[in-house]
């Protein structure tokens, strides 16, 4: 596939993902599969397309471009999950105000997970909090997300996607760019 076709396909998928997300606003029956379909179109697709197209522009083979597409997919999913967590835990001073997605009724994976895990009165409580959300219900929401293990579940998924992305990079043919990947980062130096 050439770069123009890749970008055109990505743009189509962004629009499809946005429409899917709109159809799931406030939908407490949204599944993890629905969630991934939404983010794969509107967030992940641009990451995957960008990394694959960059590989082709740099003269990489079709095989390497496909690997970079898979890398971008995993990286984009990790990015979106981090964004979901920051929406629930963010600090405006860090540039991410808390609660934008919740106020808009967007069903993020931590919310979907909690709705799946909680049962009985706890699930009913969460459904009420989400359906009638206001800033004075933050403590209720975060308590229910903690109770369901949704924060730790999402953090584990982020780590899984990062690990898969790094595994893909480790399988790329040797190159100068790979030296950057294998060099220790300042964070790793202690």
Regions found by a protein language model. Give the residues of each.
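Single conserved hydrophobic/aromatic residue that forms the stacking wall/gate
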Residues: 184-190
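All-alpha prenyltransferase/terpene-synthase fold signal
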Residues: 1-183
């Amino acid at each position: 596939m050439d770069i123009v076709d890749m970008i055109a396909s990505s743009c189509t998928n962004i629009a499809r993902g946005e429409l899917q997300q709109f159809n799931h606003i406030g939908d407490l029956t949204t599944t993890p599969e629905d969630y991934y379909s939404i983010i794969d179109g509107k967030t992940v697709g641009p990451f995957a397309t960008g990394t694959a197209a960059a590989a082709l522009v740099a003269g990489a083979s079709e095989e390497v471009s496909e690997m970079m597409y898979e890398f971008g997919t995993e990286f984009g999913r990790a990015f979106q999950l981090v964004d979901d967590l920051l929406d629930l835990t963010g600090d405006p001073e860090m540039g991410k105000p808390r609660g934008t997605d919740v106020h808009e009724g967007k069903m993020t994976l931590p919310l979907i997970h909690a709705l799946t895990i909680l049962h009985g009165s706890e699930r009913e409580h969460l459904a009420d909090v989400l359906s009638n959300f206001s800033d004075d219900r933050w403590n209720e929401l975060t308590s229910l997300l903690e109770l369901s293990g949704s924060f730790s579940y999402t953090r584990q998924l982020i780590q899984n996607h990062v690990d898969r992305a790094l595994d893909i990079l480790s399988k790329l043919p040797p190159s100068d760019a790979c030296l950057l990947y294998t060099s220790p980062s300042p964070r790793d130096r202690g």
